[in-house]
């Protein structure tokens, strides 16, 4: 009887071991320069808000690696140190590699392994440029309130048109 229990236990543990080895995962890895001793957070951007998935205190080389169970539908994550954020899209079991430089990692980074992540970076940079344009218009002392409103509307409409034609209409089902 104890031999049967031992054999069953061994078989169950072996099956569990194989299942865990075969678990499909995605990977986010890379390095962030100039961020030694900073805490890098890997966060899920879900419908219930931001949830921390994992974190790591970066060493002198800034290397990091996170992974998670493969997703059935694309999900958004972000890498964050303080107020600096890099948005990442995960689809299936891909490996996304990020190389960045702190403290300007939100704008000074490279991403590979995902076309979606590259597009997200382009859109984030475009949005930052839009915000800068709006701020410059609002601070212009030569413009009255109506001229500011008109100018802001024009740059926002130009931004929307650009996003529609270069991203949405280009791949409407993506």
Go through the PLM ranges and name each one:
Residues 1-8:
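Bacterial N-terminal signal peptides that target proteins for export
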Residues 16-20:
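C-terminal motif of bacterial Sec signal peptides marking the signal peptidase cleavage site
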């Amino acid at each position: 009887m104890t031999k049967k229990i031992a054999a069953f236990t061994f078989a169950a543990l072996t099956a569990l071991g194989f299942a865990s080895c075969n678990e499909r995962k995605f990977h986010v890895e890379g390095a962030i320069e100039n961020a030694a001793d900073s805490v890098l957070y890997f966060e899920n951007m879900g419908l219930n808000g931001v949830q921390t998935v994992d974190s790591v205190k970066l060493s002198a080389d800034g290397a990091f690696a996170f992974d998670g169970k493969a997703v059935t539908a694309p999900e958004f994550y972000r890498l964050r140190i303080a107020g600096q954020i890099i948005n990442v899209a995960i689809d299936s079991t891909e490996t996304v590699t990020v190389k960045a430089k702190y403290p300007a990692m939100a704008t000074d980074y490279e991403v590979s392994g995902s076309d979606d992540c590259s597009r997200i970076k382009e859109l984030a940079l475009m949005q930052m440029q839009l915000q800068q344009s709006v701020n410059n218009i609002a601070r212009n002392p030569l413009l009255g309130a109506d001229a500011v409103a008109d100018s802001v509307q024009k740059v926002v409409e130009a931004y929307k048109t650009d996003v529609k034609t270069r991203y949405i209409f280009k791949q409407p089902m993506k």
